[in-house]
Amino acid sequence: DSFDFIVGNPPYVPIEGLSEEEKARYKAEFETASGRFDLYILFLERALDLLAPDGRLTFVTPEKWEYVKAAAPLRKLLGARGIQVEEINHIEEDAFTGLVTFPSVTTIQGEGQGKTKVVLRDGTVHTTTLPDNGQSWAAKIRGADLSEMETGVTLGEVTTRVSAGMATGADSVFVEKRSEVPPSLKPDWVHPTVSGRQLGKNGSPRSDSVLICPYRANGTLVEEQELGAFGEWAQSHRARLEDRSCVKKAGKKWYAWHETPPMQDLLQPKIVFKDIEKEPRFWAERKGDVIPRHSVYYLVPDQGVSFDELLEYLNSPIAQEWMEANCQRAANGFLRLQSRVLRQLP
């Protein structure tokens, strides 16, 4: 059976809310169940299957399906089937009481070609032609003309790494004020560190915090029998450290961090920035000794790439305009500066 009209507000259930059995079943049944898919994406696919060729579908969903990687198969499916996205209306971010979901009302026509009408939250209206190959729609929907930025080279191609900082799984243990670190641990077992909050407050990657670190400069974990002063200190926190998922589920050593640090990249001169920011800003960490925490991202320029020119470009109005057009929205007008997106910056 097919339907002339389909209207829905499907459940927003991230992949973490699904059981392993559900994930396996959905991946076998739906083209769009790939990566970190959300349940509403599958509802959209099934609705498209049920839509008559000349029918019309209107769904309320989070706007992020328009640009996140997990929804690329759905965007590609629309293009492959020749389905016309007639209108996208970004309604108030807090339209659902108590939730900030950045909802979007999307109206789809079963068959057709042409431009898409876009209504943004600030009331501006424009029409655009959406990519039909699964690429992000963000820049098109937000009305940004960034064609002059195309250089044939992206940020990902001139950097060794663009990545989030380290997650220890127990910052309350591994992060200390420098003045409060036991003397026996200094300097061999500590590295300067910075959080997103400190970066914004200080305006610099320098802070009074350090990470107590059981890793060598090459990124290998020091063996337990060689821990010395670190081992004596860590024993007093052993119960807390053993209670982490990386130990209980992933089988990591009880004193290891949640993530294994790529020390050879971390301990390089780098550019750092907050993971969520209203107006993106980038700072130089020239000494190459700061290990950013998980709320701070960092990028390491390739050899031969001018550190200062890259830093200046990232803080330039044109680069900021690109981020405004392409980055995922967060609450209160903030942007998420995700490495996957930033690597595509021209």
State what each model feature region is.
Residues D1-F174, R293-S295:
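Signature of N6-adenine DNA methyltransferases within the class I
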Residues G134-P346:
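Polybasic, glycine- and aromatic-enriched phosphate-binding surface used to engage nucleic acids
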